[in-house]
Amino acid sequence: MLFSVFYLSLFLSVGLLSARRAVPDRSAAVIVPLGCGFGVSLLAVLPALFAVVLGFTLPAAALAAVAAAGIGAALLYRGTRLRGMAKDPDGGALWACLLPVVLITLYLLHTHVLHLVDGAYHTGQSCYGDMPMHLGFIKYIAQSGEFLPRYPLLGGTHRFGYPFLCETVSSVFVVLGADLRTAYLLPVLPAFLSVYGMFWQLARRVTDSAGKACLAFYLFFMGSGLGFAYFLGSADSFAGIFTGFYTTPTNFVEKNIEWVNPIVDLLIPQRATLFGWCVLLPAVYLLWRFCYEGERRLWPWLAALVLPLPLLHTHSALALVLLCLVGGVYTLAQGPRRKTLLPWLGLAAVCGAAWLCQMLPTVLAQS
């Protein structure tokens, strides 16, 4: 387990250096969640690159660590340092906003992911279907070493069409010797920090108000409507949300209620959504600065960040494409065509080539 923690720390350290290099004018309140996004992206990309040649094996994981260390060394050589970050008067508001939700999330992860109680593994109702699938994929990729992976339940005749990089970010820790629960949780922790922190920073950037960013954060992550009110009529009904078998307000068909909370119904059970948003929200933050604030130098960092996005969460990749199309039209209408167009062409060329190479033998091959 200690070796796995060290391995993750290496990738997160390189991610923090990358974030610092990309936005050197920002405070730790931006660098930390943005760095987590970069770190998870690297954790998805580098082991997979070497696994294409060597299989998903220990040598591939070791070479990925060497490559990550090389990137970190190059950034340090170029003078990138984590000390001396800018001060942010709104940094306290971010951490005060995030801390209660982070604590709730940590508790839910503890109780929902292979929680051993009296010899039995416990989870939450939202994970009944998703978690067995994810655990099976994580273990299979690590044990078989086959890459690109194939669906084990289909006799190995079909390659994954599912965005499997959300599984390999945990499979690599199984290869390194971690138990399944540890491997499952290790990359999830920085992913949540990236999602929460970069949502707040994006809202802060768009609204130009820390107060509005806090309001947007809680409306989104703690919202979902009042469908749970039907379960407040008795103590037994309310307790059933936590102890019953499919007795949550998520799909309460008797009252035509669908109550979906982003944390408990999407991010905790659906790893593809979590890791997709972990990269998408930092990417949209960089896209906002690149597109609407004229920071054209950010396009290589944006491209590097989103390299694994189609095989982390295909829907997030599609969302980013649509946002880029809107942003591209906006910027072309605002400034000189040549100066404006070149960064967009660079972003499109890098992402288009990388994403096509990923999707042709996987998602598109199974369509």
Feature names for model-found ranges:
Residues M1-V14, A96-V101, D130-P132, P269-Y285, ...:
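Alpha-helical transmembrane segments at the extracellular/periplasmic loop-to-helix junctions
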Residues V53-L63, M85-W95, A210-A213, R297, ...:
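Membrane-interfacial entry segments at the cytosolic side of transmembrane helices
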Residues L103-V279, H315:
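Active-site lumenal/periplasmic loops and adjacent helix-entry segments of GT-C-fold
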Residues V264-L267, L286, W299-T314:
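Membrane-interface alpha helices of multi-pass inner-membrane proteins
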Residues L287, Y292-R297, A319-C351:
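Perimembrane helix-loop-helix junctions
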